[in-house]
Amino acid sequence: TTKGPMSISITLIGVQKNKILTRSGAKTGHDIYVTGNIGSARAALILDKKTKGYKYFRKSLVMPLPRVALGLELSEFASSCIDISDGLAKDLKSIAISSKKGFQVNVDSIPTDPKFDIYVKASLKEQCILGGGEDYELCFTANKKYARKINNISSKYKIKITRIGVIKSTGYSYSLNSKQYNPKVSGYDHFKGN
């Protein structure tokens, strides 16, 4: 993420034979998971650079940790997967569209850093956890029968993996405090430059 006049991007593409994780395999009834904490990179972007909060979250923005080894293990059984680069709401919707499915997400279940509520105003929380990208955590779906395996992988890598919802046959819905919730953010749009 840059506000400067120049941006350089490098892309490497490769395929692990017979273990391809795509966006298009989610099935109705599969659980939705995320790795790590969501919203930290966006928090760094919106907080004043002179604050303790910015200093605390800065590493999440400038040095995200790719979940490569964890992703390789997930490729054994996950039905779909995407990295959270454009915001959880947008990236999860990409899985749903590619899979021709819907989803239900419990916003209360989306994990944030333990100090998130200390440094980020409540009014900015949605923008960070649903609309903010650059976390590069994984959002994936898996059959319920893999719940124990997912817990074991979480322990093995010492990376939190949290169930945040379920794939539905149609529609996109969110709940917050056990009530229907309509997010006001949609994620990063590369063509708008937001």
How should each PLM-predicted stretch be described?
Residues 1-8, 13, 18, 76, ...:
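Glycine-/charge-enriched secondary-structure boundary and capping motifs
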Residues 1-47, 166:
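Glycine-rich anion-binding loops of enzyme active sites
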Residues 10-22, 55-73, 121:
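Active-site glycine-rich loop that binds ribose-phosphate moieties when present
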Residues 21, 45, 61, 188-191:
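Short clusters of hydrophobic/aromatic residues that line enzyme substrate/ligand-binding pockets
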Residues 30-36, 64-88:
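Internal active-site segments that recognize and position negatively charged phosphoryl groups
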Residues 36-50, 151-161:
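Short secondary-structure transition/capping segments
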Residues 44, 49-65, 115-117:
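A short, charged helix-loop
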Residues 49-50, 70-73, 128-130:
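A short alpha-helix capping/helix-coil boundary motif
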